[in-house]
From Swiss-Prot:
Family: Belongs to the frog skin active peptide (FSAP) family. Aurein subfamily.
Post-translational note: Amidation is essential for antibacterial activity against Gram-positive bacteria.
Propeptide position ranges: 23-49, 69-72
UniProt keyword list: Amidation, Amphibian defense peptide, Antibiotic, Antimicrobial, Cleavage on pair of basic residues, Immunity, Innate immunity, Membrane, Secreted, Signal, Target cell membrane, Target membrane
Basic and acidic residues composition bias: residue spans: 38-47
One Pfam family cited in the UniProt record for this chain: FSAP_sig_propep
Species in which this protein is naturally found: Ranoidea aurea (Green and golden bell frog)
GO CC annotation, single: membrane
Its biological purpose: Amphipathic alpha-helical antimicrobial peptide with weak to moderate activity against Gram-positive bacteria, and no activity against Gram-negative bacteria. Probably acts by disturbing membrane functions with its amphipathic structure. Strongly inhibits the formation of NO by neuronal nitric oxide synthase (nNOS) at micromolar concentrations. Acts by a non-competitive mechanism, probably by binding to calcium/calmodulin and as a consequence blocking calmodulin attachment to nNOS.
Main location: secreted
Region (Disordered): 27-47
Name of the molecule in the record: Aurein-2.3
Length: 72
């Protein structure tokens, strides 16, 4: 009976250790994903700003062409 108790405790202990390790890895992966999302959000903002600048220039150029045609 004592042998079964020791075996059972050993199995439970090893199960808890592996569960603890898995939880720790999940937390680390979650933090990494949060950091990646923040970096992607910043890159997306920079891309939007760059695109907005290009659109502004194109609209300005089209507007100036329209003004030139009105003058002629």
């Amino acid at each position: 009976m004592a042998f079964l108790k020791k075996s059972l405790f050993l199995v439970l202990f090893l199960g808890l250790v592996s569960l603890s390790i898995c939880e720790k890895e999940k937390r680390q992966n979650g933090e990494d994903e949060d950091e990646n999302e923040a970096a992607n959000h910043e890159e997306g903002s920079e891309e939007k700003r760059g695109l907005f600048d290009i659109v502004k220039k194109v609209v300005g150029a089209i507007g100036s062409l329209g003004k030139r045609n009105d003058v002629e």
